[in-house]
Regions:
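Conserved alpha-helical scaffold flanking the Walker A/P-loop in AAA+ ATPase domains
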Residues: 39-42, 95-115
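Conserved C-terminal "switch" segment of AAA+ ATPases
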Residues: 8-16, 29, 166, 180-253, ...
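Walker A/P-loop
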Residues: 44-81
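C-terminal engagement/docking regions of AAA+ P-loop ATPases
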Residues: 1-8, 13, 245-329
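Conserved AAA+/SF3 P-loop NTPase catalytic/coupling segment centered on the Walker-B
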Residues: 108-135, 149, 164-173, 185-193
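AAA+/SF3 P-loop NTPase mechanochemical coupling elements
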Residues: 103-112, 141-158, 169-178
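Pre-Walker A (pre-P-loop) alpha-helix and adjacent loop at the N terminus of AAA/AAA+ ATPase modules
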Residues: 12-58
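P-loop (Walker A) phosphate-binding loop of NTP-binding proteins
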Residues: 55, 89, 157
Length: 329
């Protein structure tokens, strides 16, 4: 087994060489959001979409656009509004009166990295069109089906403050996002660095292309081979099952949980932990990798009860209690 682990470690070391210049390049224009940029890259490597919650002005758009520039892929931004139609996302067929036929006009979903801004402002049929494209990695326009080009990552944002005129995502649709991130303000020192950076540059700072898309696809193949010990697999399954039946693990949170995490959470937690280990240069997953990425995988998959809300308990507080009390292998 040690020989196999050594081979995987070597493969990870070789395949992850691009991550250092990638993060260095992102660090030139994005200050104080290392958590955001690392999780974006994890989503990209694990082939999972990301739901982002944070107030405006926290470099969400800049991060995604800069990442797209760094890896030579196409970036697209969708600003969702209540009057949008599915055709505004996936495209439509246009009638040509001269030829008497229809031509296909592809929508902004045909890109590699997509920022879906304020997804909860779009009506359900538009959300459904986007989420179907995310799940199937293909789009149907008229009677034609088009495959979406890899790598393909959707970063959808929600504003936690403004809830008027919004259409909250149903649990079944939120579950399709591998990660949900909560982004906070930068530290005071980091904010001063941002001010200095803007003083030195005219306009918005930009990044250079340092990674080829083939590097991302190769990294995904290596990540699939990263080793997870049976004990760590059991730990992952226990974590997810503890959100459904906490009393089985002697964790006193059952009255606060309305709906636990689905089996998709188990799969995504394993994939995200592998991608996290890859970024750390390892060919195997540790329980700490699972704990480090676990909150981002689980926070949007655990629905809380009215009793929990009355006691100001969030899904994060409940999940953290499970992490704290569940034995680590």
């Amino acid at each position: 087994m040690s020989t196999g682990i050594n081979a995987i470690n070597e493969a990870v070391k070789e395949a992850s060489a691009f991550t250092r210049p990638l993060f260095n390049e992102l660090g030139k224009v994005i200050i104080g959001q290392s958590y955001l940029t690392e999780r974006l890259v994890i989503g990209l490597l694990a082939n999972g979409h990301v739901l982002l919650e944070g107030v405006p002005g926290l470099a969400k758009t800049l991060s995604v656009k800069s990442l797209a520039n760094c890896i030579r892929v196409k970036f697209s931004r969708l600003q969702f509004t209540p009057d949008m139609l599915p055709a505004d996302v996936i495209g439509t067929q246009i009638y040509n009166p001269q030829s008497g036929g229809f031509s296909t006009r592809k929508g902004p979903i045909f890109a590699n990295l997509i920022l879906a801004d304020e997804i909860n402002r779009a009506p359900a049929k538009v959300q459904s069109a986007l989420l179907e494209a995310m799940q199937e990695k293909q789009v149907t326009i008229g009677d034609q089906t088009f495959k979406l080009e890899e790598p393909f990552l959707v970063l959808a944002t929600q504003n936690p403050i403004e809830q008027e005129g919004t259409y909250p995502l149903p649990e079944a649709q939120v579950d399709r996002f591998m990660l949900k991130l909560k982004i906070g303000y930068p530290a005071r020192g980091e904010e001063r660095q941002i001010l200095d950076l803007m003083a030195r540059t005219s306009g918005t700072p930009t990044t250079s292309a340092v990674v080829d898309p083939k590097d991302i696809l190769k990294a995904r193949e290596v990540i699939n081979d990263i080793y997870i010990d049976d004990k760590v697999k059991e730990y992952i399954v226990d974590l997810v099952c503890a959100t459904r039946e906490p009393e089985q693990y002697k964790i006193q949170v059952k009255d606060f949980i309305q709906l636990g995490a689905s089996p998709r959470a188990t799969i995504n937690l394993a994939l995200a932990a592998k991608a996290y280990a890859f970024l750390k240069g390892r060919g195997y997953v540790t329980p700490q990798d699972v704990k480090s990425i676990g909150m981002d995988v689980l926070r949007h998959r655990v629905a809380i009860t009215y009793e929990a809300e009355a006691e100001d308990k969030t899904s994060e507080i409940i999940i953290q209690k499970i992490f704290d009390e569940l034995p680590v292998p």
